[in-house]
Regions:
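C-terminal helical "lid" subdomain and adjoining coupling/linker elements of P-loop NTPases
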Residues: 148, 163-216
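Conserved RecA-like P-loop NTPase ATPase core
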Residues: 8, 29, 46, 61, ...
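Single conserved hydrophobic/aromatic residue that forms the stacking wall/gate
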Residues: 1-11
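Post-Walker A helix-loop "phosphate-sensing" segment adjacent to the P-loop in P-loop NTPases
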Residues: 12-24
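Conserved C-terminal "switch" segment of AAA+ ATPases
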Residues: 18-21, 104-110, 116, 122-170, ...
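Conserved P-loop NTPase "ATPase switch" module shared by AAA+ and STAND
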Residues: 29-30, 53-72
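Canonical AAA+ ATPase core
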Residues: 64-71, 80-126, 131, 143-144, ...
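Short glycine-rich substrate-engagement loop in P-loop NTPases that contacts/grips substrate
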Residues: 24-53
Length: 216
């Protein structure tokens, strides 16, 4: 989302301004960008990502997913071990930022003795407001070439105002917005599948009835 991206770029620019990094570029990944399914592949993939981020900022979103896997077939820990070594080897020209929900990130930091010593500066971002989540929804619609009707937009505002106020279990900020839009698009597809005359405007327009009743 645009708001989160602005925060990342601001942090990057500050490190660049004080000379902590030489290039100032941003490399953003999540678990899928680091972990592979076979022994040895994860270390190699993670090392390549680290190499690509040298001189800049490596941003790892939902970093806790690297250490909360179950069973011996999970290679997230291999990525963490490689990351820690890379941070030590390149500590003079690499900034690594890990992000995620507070409680899960605490578990992540507790999973390896080396993590807390290396990740010892914390920034707590407030949850998105309802209006920010609606803005993210509108932007995501544009990216996927959808539009919200006036009534649909009002329904979205009602939904996110209530959800942000109550913050039910599983509340997930921008991920809620993505899931909400996916369900709205699915509902719209079901609604128009039986229509005889469907033009581009109908295909692109999400109506209030496509949003009413969505549960996350």
């Amino acid at each position: 989302p645009r708001v989160r991206r602005q925060r990342q770029m601001c942090i990057r620019d500050r490190y660049k301004a004080i000379g902590a990094i030489s290039k100032g570029h941003l490399v953003e990944v999540d678990r899928s960008g680091l972990v592979c399914g076979y022994i040895g592949q994860t270390a190699s993939k993670t090392a390549e990502v680290i190499e690509s981020a040298l001189g800049g900022v490596l941003f790892i979103d939902e970093a806790y997913t690297l250490t909360n896997g179950k069973g011996q077939g999970d290679f997230g820990q291999e990525a963490v071990d490689t990351l820690l070594k890379g941070m030590e080897d390149h500590r003079d020209d690499l900034v690594v930022i890990v992000a995620g929900y507070t409680e899960l990130m605490e578990e992540f930091l507790d999973s390896n003795p080396g993590l807390r010593s290396r990740f010892n500066k914390f920034i707590n971002f407030e949850d998105y407001t309802a209006e920010e989540e609606v803005e993210i929804l509108i932007n995501n619609c544009k990216k996927q070439e959808y539009m919200l009707s006036r009534d649909a937009l009002e329904e979205a505002r009602r939904f996110f105002t209530e959800r942000v106020a109550n913050k039910p279990e599983g509340y997930a900020n921008a991920r809620d917005v993505r899931n909400y839009l996916e369900k709205a698009i699915s509902n719209q597809a079901s609604r128009i599948v039986g229509l005889k005359d469907v033009d581009k405007n109908i295909l692109a327009m999400l109506e209030k009835e496509d949003l009413v009743g969505i549960e996350l």
